[in-house]
A protein has these predicted regions:
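Structural signal for the C-terminal ends of transmembrane alpha-helices
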Residues: 12-25, 75-76, 178-179, 221-227, ...
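Alpha-helical transmembrane segments of polytopic membrane proteins
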Residues: 1-8, 160, 207-211, 252
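Membrane-interface starts of transmembrane alpha-helices
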Residues: 54, 58, 62, 148-155, ...
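Juxtamembrane/interface segments at transmembrane-helix termini
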Residues: 16-27, 75-88, 176, 205-206, ...
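Start-transfer (signal-anchor) and selected internal transmembrane alpha helices
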Residues: 2-77, 278-283
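Membrane-embedded helix bundles of polyisoprenyl
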Residues: 67, 165-177, 182-266, 279-302, ...
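Juxtamembrane loop-helix boundary motifs flanking transmembrane segments in multi-pass membrane proteins
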Residues: 49, 91, 150, 182, ...
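Membrane-interface coil-to-helix junctions
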Residues: 70-168, 190-212
């Protein structure tokens, strides 16, 4: 299914290229309609950033359309065969049952909090021979709370697609941060979101798309630190990354380390020891502070390992 979907996507890319002009005209027409609606509900004083808003809106519409087309083509075999993205090995045996327990446990926590009971359930005897209650700090994972238990299987597949969308959108933010064209951002985001690794790993382990979502915005945060010594964004994202998974954070940290070294070495403005060590110390401090924000995930993870 996956390789057939990738083949269909390759054909679609080659077919769509000659129609880029038609697509641009349609994109412009949609943006003009939305701008008229925007002009009705806002005042002139509130439209100071109109050009920037127009550009971002045009890009977001274009990216969304491209993503939907590519997603339909890639996952068409699943749709035709009435299949879900639940892998029969880990997905059916681990991930979906964990989601069921999660959407049952979180409401219970809030009920206990509002009733003044802080003696939370910490162990679940209905999981195999018994296990600690698993809580995910991944923001996307919490979207499962929007679905009823009867819809979890469909929600599982839907949120995997959402992760693909967010991965491409994250790459879009990186490309646009460097002031590249919309075409460059479209190309990079679609190729990134539907890369071989993303298709292969994401359809089996949806959480493996989380580091793909975080990496591009971590690079943006690193770039802001290198250029302007602004470390706040990197600190927050390190904390969020650690909350999602310490494993994903350390893998992304390796990529960020390589990026930092190459950025310093390949940029004449920063190619000196003073800048290298100065920015390096700021990064280390930012990482320590960010890790402090997300350290609760380490306690819960290693607590589970030590008690298993």
């Amino acid at each position: 299914f996956v390789f057939l979907g990738m083949f269909l996507a390759f054909i679609a890319i080659n077919i769509c290229v000659p129609f880029a002009g038609i697509y641009a005209a349609l994109e412009e027409a949609v943006v003009n309609i939305l701008e008229r609606v925007w002009g009705i509900i806002t005042t002139p004083a509130s439209r100071e950033g109109e050009e920037n808003w127009r550009s971002l809106l045009r890009y977001f519409i274009g990216y969304t359309v491209l993503f939907v087309v590519m997603a339909v083509l890639i996952f068409l075999p699943y749709i035709l065969q009435n299949k879900t993205l639940i892998w029969e090995a880990d997905g059916l045996g681990q991930y979906v049952p964990k989601v069921y327990r999660f959407i049952q446990y979180i409401p219970e926590i809030f009920k206990d909090i509002f009733s003044g009971n802080f003696d939370f359930k910490q162990y679940d005897f209905t999981t195999g021979l018994g296990a600690t209650v698993a809580i995910s700090y991944d923001p996307v994972y919490w979207l499962y709370l929007l679905f009823s238990p009867a819809k979890i299987e469909k929600a599982y597949s839907f949120l995997i697609i959402v992760r693909y969308f967010l991965a491409g959108l994250s790459m879009s933010g990186l490309v646009l941060y460097f002031k590249k064209s919309h075409f460059a951002a479209y190309t990079a985001s679609i190729v990134y979101a539907f890369s071989g690794y993303a298709i292969y790993a994401g359809t089996k382990h949806g959480q493996f798309l989380t580091p793909m979502i975080l990496l591009p915005i971590l690079v943006v945060a690193m770039e802001r630190l290198i250029r302007n010594r602004k470390w706040y964004m990197l600190t927050v994202l390190v904390g969020v990354s650690l909350l999602c998974s310490y494993y994903f954070l350390y893998m992304n940290t390796i990529a960020l380390g390589i990026y930092f070294v190459l950025r310093i070495v390949c940029t004449e403005e920063y190619r000196n020891w003073k800048t290298f060590f100065e920015r390096g110390f700021i990064i280390v401090g930012s990482y320590i502070l960010g890790a402090s924000l997300g350290v609760i995930s380490l306690f819960t993870s290693f607590g589970s390992y030590m008690g298993s």
